[in-house]
UniProtKB/Swiss-Prot annotation:
Function: Cytochrome b5 is a membrane-bound hemoprotein functioning as an electron carrier for several membrane-bound oxygenases.
Binding site for heme: H59, H83
Modification Phosphoserine, positions: S23, S37, S84
Record-annotated membrane-spanning stretches: 123-140
Record carries keyword Metal-binding: yes
Upper taxonomic lineage: Eukaryota, Metazoa, Chordata, Craniata, Vertebrata
Record carries keyword Transmembrane helix: yes
Propeptide residues according to the Swiss-Prot or TrEMBL record: 1-15
Name this polypeptide is given: Cytochrome b5 type B
Length: 150
Protein backbone atom coordinates (compact mmCIF):
# COMPACT_ATOMS: atom_id res chain seq x y z
CA UNK A 1 0.00 0.00 0.00
CA UNK A 2 1.42 3.36 -0.94
CA UNK A 3 0.20 6.57 0.61
CA UNK A 4 -3.51 6.75 1.19
CA UNK A 5 -4.59 4.76 -1.84
CA UNK A 6 -4.43 1.01 -2.44
CA UNK A 7 -5.57 -1.32 -5.17
CA UNK A 8 -6.85 -4.81 -4.56
CA UNK A 9 -7.37 -7.47 -7.19
CA UNK A 10 -10.45 -9.63 -6.93
CA UNK A 11 -11.87 -12.29 -9.17
CA UNK A 12 -15.51 -13.03 -9.74
CA UNK A 13 -17.94 -14.36 -12.28
CA UNK A 14 -19.55 -12.34 -15.04
CA UNK A 15 -22.77 -14.37 -14.79
CA UNK A 16 -21.89 -16.38 -17.91
CA UNK A 17 -19.48 -18.72 -16.17
CA UNK A 18 -16.46 -16.65 -17.18
CA UNK A 19 -13.98 -15.54 -14.53
CA UNK A 20 -13.46 -11.77 -14.56
CA UNK A 21 -10.61 -9.92 -12.90
CA UNK A 22 -11.77 -6.73 -11.24
CA UNK A 23 -9.66 -4.10 -9.59
CA UNK A 24 -10.90 -2.05 -6.66
CA UNK A 25 -9.10 1.11 -5.66
CA UNK A 26 -9.28 1.89 -1.95
CA UNK A 27 -9.08 5.44 -0.64
CA UNK A 28 -8.43 6.59 2.90
CA UNK A 29 -10.82 9.12 4.42
CA UNK A 30 -7.97 11.64 4.69
CA UNK A 31 -7.47 11.44 0.92
CA UNK A 32 -11.18 11.97 0.24
CA UNK A 33 -11.31 14.88 2.69
CA UNK A 34 -8.77 16.78 0.54
CA UNK A 35 -11.12 16.64 -2.46
CA UNK A 36 -13.64 19.25 -1.33
CA UNK A 37 -13.47 22.12 -3.82
CA UNK A 38 -15.02 23.15 -7.13
CA UNK A 39 -11.88 21.90 -8.90
CA UNK A 40 -12.08 18.41 -7.43
CA UNK A 41 -15.05 17.13 -5.45
CA UNK A 42 -15.38 13.61 -4.05
CA UNK A 43 -18.23 12.12 -2.04
CA UNK A 44 -18.53 8.93 -0.03
CA UNK A 45 -21.88 7.14 -0.24
CA UNK A 46 -22.26 3.78 1.47
CA UNK A 47 -18.52 3.18 1.57
CA UNK A 48 -18.01 3.95 -2.11
CA UNK A 49 -16.08 6.96 -3.41
CA UNK A 50 -17.47 9.09 -6.23
CA UNK A 51 -15.73 11.90 -8.13
CA UNK A 52 -18.67 14.19 -8.89
CA UNK A 53 -16.60 17.14 -10.11
CA UNK A 54 -18.05 16.87 -13.65
CA UNK A 55 -21.59 16.74 -12.20
CA UNK A 56 -21.40 19.98 -10.19
CA UNK A 57 -23.12 22.17 -12.78
CA UNK A 58 -25.75 19.54 -13.59
CA UNK A 59 -26.90 18.67 -10.06
CA UNK A 60 -30.60 19.60 -9.72
CA UNK A 61 -30.08 20.81 -6.15
CA UNK A 62 -27.21 23.08 -7.15
CA UNK A 63 -23.50 22.84 -6.55
CA UNK A 64 -23.84 24.14 -2.97
CA UNK A 65 -25.54 20.91 -1.90
CA UNK A 66 -22.63 18.86 -3.20
CA UNK A 67 -20.04 21.22 -1.74
CA UNK A 68 -21.60 20.84 1.72
CA UNK A 69 -21.05 17.07 1.55
CA UNK A 70 -17.68 17.17 -0.21
CA UNK A 71 -14.91 15.06 1.24
CA UNK A 72 -17.09 13.35 3.85
CA UNK A 73 -19.54 10.47 4.14
CA UNK A 74 -22.69 11.77 2.44
CA UNK A 75 -24.68 8.52 2.78
CA UNK A 76 -27.26 9.86 5.22
CA UNK A 77 -27.86 13.07 3.25
CA UNK A 78 -28.09 11.10 0.00
CA UNK A 79 -30.77 8.81 1.46
CA UNK A 80 -32.65 11.62 3.23
CA UNK A 81 -33.22 13.39 -0.09
CA UNK A 82 -34.81 10.26 -1.53
CA UNK A 83 -32.94 10.08 -4.83
CA UNK A 84 -34.70 8.32 -7.70
CA UNK A 85 -33.53 5.04 -9.21
CA UNK A 86 -32.32 7.09 -12.21
CA UNK A 87 -30.14 9.20 -9.91
CA UNK A 88 -28.75 6.06 -8.28
CA UNK A 89 -27.99 4.62 -11.72
CA UNK A 90 -26.32 7.88 -12.80
CA UNK A 91 -24.11 7.77 -9.70
CA UNK A 92 -22.39 4.64 -11.02
CA UNK A 93 -20.61 6.60 -13.76
CA UNK A 94 -18.81 8.70 -11.12
CA UNK A 95 -17.58 5.72 -9.07
CA UNK A 96 -13.80 5.69 -8.59
CA UNK A 97 -13.26 3.29 -5.70
CA UNK A 98 -14.12 2.26 -2.15
CA UNK A 99 -13.21 3.56 1.27
CA UNK A 100 -10.41 1.51 2.79
CA UNK A 101 -11.91 -1.21 5.03
CA UNK A 102 -10.05 0.08 8.09
CA UNK A 103 -11.78 3.48 7.67
CA UNK A 104 -15.28 2.04 7.43
CA UNK A 105 -17.35 2.44 10.56
CA UNK A 106 -19.55 -0.50 11.49
CA UNK A 107 -23.16 0.12 10.59
CA UNK A 108 -25.82 -0.84 13.11
CA UNK A 109 -28.53 -0.82 10.45
CA UNK A 110 -28.51 -0.65 6.70
CA UNK A 111 -29.65 2.58 5.06
CA UNK A 112 -29.88 0.86 1.68
CA UNK A 113 -33.55 1.23 0.68
CA UNK A 114 -33.59 -2.15 -1.02
CA UNK A 115 -32.86 -3.73 2.36
CA UNK A 116 -34.91 -1.32 4.46
CA UNK A 117 -38.47 -2.41 5.27
CA UNK A 118 -39.51 0.71 7.18
CA UNK A 119 -40.62 2.58 4.06
CA UNK A 120 -43.02 -0.18 3.05
CA UNK A 121 -45.45 1.27 5.60
CA UNK A 122 -44.73 4.95 4.75
CA UNK A 123 -48.03 5.21 2.89
CA UNK A 124 -49.81 4.59 6.20
CA UNK A 125 -48.49 7.88 7.55
CA UNK A 126 -50.36 9.74 4.80
CA UNK A 127 -53.30 7.60 3.76
CA UNK A 128 -54.72 6.90 7.23
CA UNK A 129 -55.03 10.58 8.24
CA UNK A 130 -56.55 11.39 4.84
CA UNK A 131 -59.14 8.62 5.20
CA UNK A 132 -59.88 9.82 8.74
CA UNK A 133 -60.39 13.40 7.54
CA UNK A 134 -62.70 12.26 4.73
CA UNK A 135 -64.77 10.17 7.15
CA UNK A 136 -65.05 13.08 9.56
CA UNK A 137 -66.20 15.29 6.68
CA UNK A 138 -68.92 12.81 5.69
CA UNK A 139 -70.08 12.42 9.29
CA UNK A 140 -70.22 16.19 9.70
CA UNK A 141 -72.29 16.60 6.51
CA UNK A 142 -74.57 13.73 7.50
CA UNK A 143 -75.34 15.12 10.96
CA UNK A 144 -75.68 18.74 9.80
CA UNK A 145 -78.04 17.79 6.96
CA UNK A 146 -80.07 15.54 9.30
CA UNK A 147 -80.54 18.36 11.82
CA UNK A 148 -81.82 20.70 9.07
CA UNK A 149 -84.44 18.19 7.87
CA UNK A 150 -85.95 17.68 11.35
Amino acid sequence: MSGSMATAEASGSDGKGQEVETSVTYYRLEEVAKRNSLKELWLVIHGRVYDVTRFLNEHPGGEEVLLEQAGVDASESFEDVGHSSDAREMLKQYYIGDIHPSDLKPESGSKDPSKNDTCKSCWAYWILPIIGAVLLGFLYRYYTSESKSS
